[in-house]
Design a protein with these regions (language model features):
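Bacterial N-terminal signal peptides
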Residues: 21-30
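Structural signature of tandem-repeat unit edges
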Residues: 60-68, 78-100, 110-123, 133-146, ...
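Consensus positions within tandem repeat domains that build extended binding/scaffold surfaces
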Residues: 103-104, 125-128, 150-151
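Short, aromatic/basic amphipathic alpha-helical patches
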Residues: 151, 170-185
């Protein structure tokens, strides 16, 4: 005849096994849910895509590329005397690096006398300043910029000054040569950053 103590020990071991099993299952389920949630949130982030003439969060009209860059097509209409092009724009929640100034980008800034281009700008496109009749000073912070031959088409550049701050002597010389080909007849100055 077995005693109550002998019956109690196996039951106690059984309860421990059940509890260990439940705890392990709970931990495993929690880990799977956490991993799933992490994977799910990672796939939600929108990717850069090619779009033409879309409105950015700052009101500018831009064209975007799948590599995460953007071309400024038109700044928002303004009567400000000083206009600064943003180095980044956001379209549909995606941030794009502004690298190019497109045709007639400053046509809406008819009163602007000073235009500042960020260090991210790599290209000043054809007819970029066409329509910007009041501009007298252009500040360029880039180290190297390509200038299209018709960038200043229809603009009187004789009284215009371009100030550069990020160029070496060699880069400045090459930049001046490009400006000459583009018909620029104003002054180019190197200024401190």
């Amino acid at each position: 005849q077995s005693s109550g103590k002998e019956d109690y020990i196996p039951m106690n071991k059984l309860i421990k096994k059940v509890l260990v099993g439940i705890t392990a299952a709970t931990m495993m389920f929690g880990s799977v849910c956490t991993a799933y949630a992490a994977t799910d949130s990672a796939t939600v982030a929108p990717a850069p895509e090619k779009q033409t003439n879309v409105k950015a969060d700052n009101g500018a009209k831009v064209s975007t590329a799948a590599n995460g860059t953007a071309t400024v097509k038109a700044l928002p209409k303004t009567t400000k005397k000083s206009v600064t092009v943003a180095s980044k724009v956001v379209v549909d929640g995606v941030s794009y690096k502004v690298t190019t100034i497109g045709a007639k980008a400053f046509a809406n800034a008819t009163k602007a006398t000073t235009v500042t281009l960020p260090a991210s700008i790599k290209t000043i496109g054809a007819q970029a300043f066409t329509g910007a009749k009041s501009v007298k000073t252009i500040v360029i912070k880039s180290a190297s910029v390509k200038v299209a031959k018709t960038a200043f088409k229809g603009v009187n550049t004789k009284k215009m000054t371009i100030k550069v701050s990020g160029m070496s002597a060699k880069q400045l010389k090459a930049f001046k040569a490009q400006l000459k080909k583009a018909g620029f007849k104003g002054t180019v100055k190197k200024v401190s950053k």
